[in-house]
Amino acid sequence: LMMLSMVFVMITMSAESARRIAEVLEQKSDLVSPENGVKEVKDGSVRFDNVSFKYSKKAEKYALADIDLDIKSGETVGILGGTGSSKTSLIQLIPRLYDATEGTVYVGGRDVREYDLETLRSEVAVVLQKNVLFSGTIKENLRWGDPNATDEELERACRLAQADDFVRAFPDGYDTYIEQGGTNVSGGQKQRLCIARALLRKPKVLILDDSTSAVDTKTDALIRKAFADEIPDTTKIIIAQRVASVEHADKILVMDGGKILAAGTHEELMANSEIYR
């Protein structure tokens, strides 16, 4: 009898869990492609026109407020700010992971809501601080960026991301097996492989969300130089903790409390912004 009662309780709990999972799976996203969505992104320009955003309609506080921003195609833009300053919230609106609550976000001169979602997201690559490597060879992991990439394209992407040297140092090179989650490579190596994977997509906008945090300053500088020399037409948006990672950017934004408090070049901000200094 005790066994039967335990089985009954487990069945009841399982049924409730299954019901909740079904609710999640059946939930429809508000983010859908429009009918006849635009299938080409002209360039990597990005513009925020009086954008405010909150994660829930019921939320009282805005995560972003009154954001006006104009990034020309091919520019490098750095974003600095403390934890909770909504740097990541800002960049998530570009590939339309969320929609702005108020105002409009433009990519390539068009409202992001006009694009076919797959098209937009194929042209806006985001590399997170904690990205994911899958179990499989380095080649297989990189080809998540472009399944049809040639070996030469893989190697070029890794050279730009400063990953080629350490990959070639492995006995099996690009055929080295990566454990689930990338546990057999260092944090900095993992970040560089994830950057290389994003580069294989040849995006018009490349966003690095603190994704060189585990990389030493010398390698970080080499990555920035490679970007400037080899992909000048790609718009680069770099969220960083180190000023050195963005001091050579065309524009640097200083954020706090969901607002842009200061913007300009490193020299302009050093001269005019107390919070930056």
PLM features: residue spans?
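Signal-transduction coiled-coil helices of two-component systems
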Residues: 11, 28-31
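Short, solvent-exposed loop/turn elements at beta->coil junctions and helix N-caps
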Residues: 34-39
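Transmitter module of two-component histidine kinases
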Residues: 31-32, 168
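ABC-type nucleotide-binding domain
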Residues: 40-277
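Conserved E/DxxT/N motif and adjacent residues on the DHp alpha2 helix
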Residues: 23, 30, 143
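Residue-level detector of alpha-helix boundaries and kinks
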Residues: 5-6, 33, 88, 105
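Cytosolic ends of transmembrane helices, especially the final helix of ABC transmembrane type-1 domains
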Residues: 1-24
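Generic structural signal for alpha-helix termini and adjacent loop/cap motifs
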Residues: 7, 27-28, 272
